[in-house]
Amino acid sequence: MANELTWHDVLAEEKQQPYFLNTLQTVASERQSGVTIYPPQKDVFNAFRFTELGDVKVVILGQDPYHGPGQAHGLAFSVRPGIAIPPSLLNMYKELENTIPGFTRPNHGYLESWARQGVLLLNTVLTVRAGQAHSHASLGWETFTDKVISLINQHREGVVFLLWGSHAQKKGAIIDKQRHHVLKAPHPSPLSAHRGFFGCNHFVLANQWLEQRGETPIDWMPVLPAECE
């Protein structure tokens, strides 16, 4: 590994900050009072569990976790096996079909295989109430994920940031474009995909950048883990 620093090394202090402890306490209190919160507690930090800091090659920023039953599991845009593929992810698959030779759309939306290759699938807010989009947007998660982005910016070099939509682009404004490769496009949502997400070629461009740096490109074909097949 090129960079031995771990998330634990760089985030331990942040996780002791009063705002962060308040965020965790608010989420825990809501769960205890019977409110359904997504993703389940054990999955909230999966993006960091599956993609260690030293392994990050690509960052894809999402916004809110999915707020439907069984969808969110801690990786932006991804859903568990057996759950219908959400519209934004379907549009990502369409872009992949149109630009990556041999890519065929999978019958699932589970992106763990991307995460295991170094694609940090980071939502900027890490929890949500069932059926209530953006219900946890002001809890403090944004402060935490701002810190995460600044730490990647500081401790890594040559990371590709895929910033889709105005929210991600504002969030990524701090990224040093001399150190990293920033690609911007409209969001893959059906509301905006036809305004320039389709044809943005980001998946190809990300791999070209990685190859130029002598790194292994991402295999964008999502593969289910053996236990899910």
Swiss-Prot record:
The active site is at D64 (proton acceptor). Transmembrane segments: none annotated. It is an enzyme of class 3 (hydrolase). Pfam families: UDG. It comes from the Bacteria. GO terms for biological process: base-excision repair, AP site formation via deaminated base removal. One of its GO terms (molecular function) is uracil DNA N-glycosylase activity. One of its GO terms (cellular component) is cytoplasm. It is found in: Cytoplasm. InterPro entries: UDG_fam1, Ura-DNA_Glyclase_AS, Uracil-DNA_glycosylase-like, Uracil-DNA_glycosylase-like_sf. SUPFAM superfamilies: Uracil-DNA glycosylase-like. Its EC number is 3.2.2.27. Keywords: Cytoplasm, DNA damage, DNA repair, Hydrolase. Its main location: cytoplasm. It catalyses: Hydrolyzes single-stranded DNA or mismatched double-stranded DNA and polynucleotides, releasing free uracil. Excises uracil residues from the DNA which can arise as a result of misincorporation of dUMP residues by DNA polymerase or due to deamination of cytosine. Belongs to the uracil-DNA glycosylase (UDG) superfamily. UNG family. This is Uracil-DNA glycosylase. It comes from Shigella flexneri serotype 5b (strain 8401).
